[in-house]
A protein has these predicted regions:
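Alpha-helical transmembrane segments
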Residues: 27-56
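Non-transmembrane, membrane-proximal soluble domains of secreted or membrane proteins
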Residues: 2-27, 51-321
Length: 321
């Protein structure tokens, strides 16, 4: 019985901590079921061909092969059906993927200057993962590839408002927030809109502004998207976090976003799913999911440190002058 349990555990899915990850599991199951159907179908065809064209029935080989169009049409029909299934399944899941990101985690919105605290730029290198976060102003600093260096690994353009309080974390845990949505059911006399989604922080701010009981909002069980804006400094890596059902190649010169909605706090292993060099085994990291309050506290602390460091650097330059 213990052996059976071990086998079941070995073939079961890893822990799921992503709101939409069940769709990925469903896709994996669907693909394997289709593979099973194709396997059984082609095995039946294989043995049917062995039986039909056995040497005792056909002692002399015929180089022309099958003259009936039935077999040819059957094989062609099978190929067409398989392609149609592939297109339908791929279209369904791609449509699902591109429509599950909410308006709070779009990289393009951040690039256009919209405040967004839930986008993390992750840059892979041999053999570590580096993260770049927006500061308290909610804006990610502009980048310039020519500025990338040991003292500026993300190539952040200095002396810009958007990048003044950015947070850079090298070769350490990647921090992301678990933020629950509160849906406005009855806005009352406030400026809020019915159906508007608020974080706990935004909810407290609205209650402080309009007064407790001025509107009705309930936690609807959904969470905010977190977007990883992924790239690489050297070779192709692959950002893979099984519990989040996330896997995406990090390609030099390209910034590719991937989003997910974490549902459980904790530390989850990041592995590299591409052979990226002699130290590939060391290409691992940790993505740490924390609560909204912990995220706010961490961001304030890190932005404060960045600001103090910047002020100290300015003071030093002034003293030298």
């Amino acid at each position: 019985m213990e052996l059976f349990s071990d086998i079941v555990e070995a073939f079961s899915f890893p822990e799921l901590v992503s709101q939409d990850g069940g769709k990925i599991d469903g896709l994996v199951i669907a693909v394997h079921l289709l593979m099973l159907v194709l396997f059984v179908g082609w095995i039946i065809y294989y043995f049917a061909a062995l039986w039909k064209f056995r040497s005792t029935r056909n002692p002399k080989a015929d180089y022309k092969g099958v003259k009936s169009k039935t077999v040819t049409n059957s094989v062609g029909g099978g190929v067409i059906v398989a392609e149609l299934i592939l297109v339908v399944v791929a279209t369904y899941y791609w449509n699902f993927y591109v429509n599950t990101a909410d308006d709070y985690a779009h990289v393009t919105a951040v690039q256009k200057g919209k405040k967004d605290l839930h986008v993390v730029r992750v840059t892979a290198e041999q053999f570590a993962w580096n993260a770049h976060y927006p500061g308290l102003n909610g804006l990610l600093g502009e980048q310039e590839k020519a500025l990338v260096g040991a003292d500026n690994p993300f190539g952040i353009i200095p002396d810009t408002v958007s990048g003044s309080d950015d947070i850079v974390v090298l070769k350490s845990d990647i921090i992301v927030p678990l933020i629950y949505n509160h849906r406005v059911e009855n806005p009352g006399e406030t400026d809020l809109k019915p159906g508007e989604l608020l974080t706990s922080t935004e909810l407290k701010a609205a209650e402080a502004k309009y007064g407790a009981g001025a509107f009705e909002a309930v936690q609807d069980g959904t969470v905010r998207s977190v977007t990883i804006d992924l790239t690489s400094k050297d070779v192709i890596h692959s950002f893979k976090v099984l519990p989040l059902r996330v896997c995406l190649d990090a390609i030099p010169g390209l910034n590719i976003p991937i989003h997910f909605k974490p549902t459980k706090t904790g530390r989850y292993l990041i592995t590299c799913a591409q052979l990226c060099g002699d130290g590939h085994a060391r290409m691992r990291g940790v993505i740490k999911v924390i609560t909204e309050q912990e995220w706010n506290d961490w961001q304030k602390a890190e932005s404060g440190e960045a600001e103090q460091t910047e002020q100290a650097a300015v003071s030093t330059d002034e003293e030298k002058a």
